[in-house]
Amino acid sequence: MILEGKTLAAAIRENLPARAQICKTKLGRPLKLTGIGWAADYASYVYLDKEIKAAEKTGITGEVIDITEQTSHEEMLNIIKKLSTDETVDAVIVPKPLPRHLNTLEIWEALNPLKDIDGSSVLNMGRLFMCKNWAEVEAMQGFAPATAMAVIKLLDFYKIKLSGVETGVLGRSATVGKPLAHMLSCKDATVKICHSKTPSLTSSLSQCDIVISAIGKAKFVTENMVKTGAMVIDVGTNQDENGVFCGDVDFENVKKITSAITPVPGGVGPVTLACLLENIIISGERKL
């Protein structure tokens, strides 16, 4: 089975324009998304442009503030602090990773968690990791990381059982791997985090009923890493040796032995964008 995400994404986005209009009427202004654009990271900048355009189609005002390698840490920190307190800004997107000369922790500490729609601020991360079960995740103030949430929503949409299921997460980034592993554990999955230092990586992954890859390496996951009948979720966004957009998984070969697999593009990606858009609306609705 192909676990495409476009149907779920469309369902999430269906009523967002109407909700945005209600917010506009009650607040006396349209909701506003401000993104920090770092053109040196081409992929991140292109995705930000996509987010801004999708927000504008939903009835949300979009704005981009560009930074460069010459933007000092103090300047960046002041931008974040200003956006965090600006009552006309409802949501803020910050590039990941940030330029290396910036103090990442201090930036994420300064970002208002109620505007942090991608769930990357220190406070949002802390709140998430304090959650012991899924009810607490759903009730938490702020937001959980959007890509990790998109994976959970996609699994729920296809009614894939998680409780007690051995699930391997390949990747331990703060952006996806670690928060996703915790969110899966809140869904009662038995979670195994695998990474570059995991001994016998193939053996470890091939024991799992669900394999989720989020490492950013084109076609890294091959059929010998996945047991027959397992489900595979591909979070990766890469280009192969021919410049073709692809995921972490060798899709054409791995799909032959899986019971279910997400494609790239068209799998987790559309759901992530839908989650981000919904989070903008939620941020606005909390002010009503």
Swiss-Prot record:
Name its pathway: One-carbon metabolism; tetrahydrofolate interconversion
Provide this UniProt record's keywords sorted from A to Z.
Answer: Amino-acid biosynthesis, Histidine biosynthesis, Hydrolase, Methionine biosynthesis, Multifunctional enzyme, NADP, One-carbon metabolism, Oxidoreductase, Purine biosynthesis
Which terms does the UniProt entry file under GO BP?
Answer: L-histidine biosynthetic process; methionine biosynthetic process; purine nucleotide biosynthetic process; tetrahydrofolate interconversion
User: May I have one GO cellular component term?
Assistant: cytosol
> What EC number(s) does its UniProt record assign?
1.5.1.5, 3.5.4.9
Top-level taxon in the UniProt lineage: Bacteria
| Entry's Gene Ontology molecular function annotations | methenyltetrahydrofolate cyclohydrolase activity; methylenetetrahydrofolate dehydrogenase (NADP+) activity
CDD domains per record: NAD_bind_m-THF_DH_Cyclohyd (cd01080)
Residues the entry annotates as binding NADP(+): G171, R172, S173, S196, T237
Q: Give the catalysed reaction(s), semicolon-separated.
A: (6R)-5,10-methylene-5,6,7,8-tetrahydrofolate + NADP(+) = (6R)-5,10-methenyltetrahydrofolate + NADPH; (6R)-5,10-methenyltetrahydrofolate + H2O = (6R)-10-formyltetrahydrofolate + H(+)
Looking up SUPFAM superfamilies in the UniProt record yields: Aminoacid dehydrogenase-like, N-terminal domain (SSF53223), NAD(P)-binding Rossmann-fold domains (SSF51735)
Q: Which HAMAP family match?
A: THF_DHG_CYH
Subunit: Homodimer.
* Physiological role: Catalyzes the oxidation of 5,10-methylenetetrahydrofolate to 5,10-methenyltetrahydrofolate and then the hydrolysis of 5,10-methenyltetrahydrofolate to 10-formyltetrahydrofolate.
Name the family the entry cites.
Belongs to the tetrahydrofolate dehydrogenase/cyclohydrolase family.
Q: What is this protein called?
A: Bifunctional protein FolD
* Organism encoding this protein: Elusimicrobium minutum (strain Pei191)
Q: Gene for this protein?
A: folD
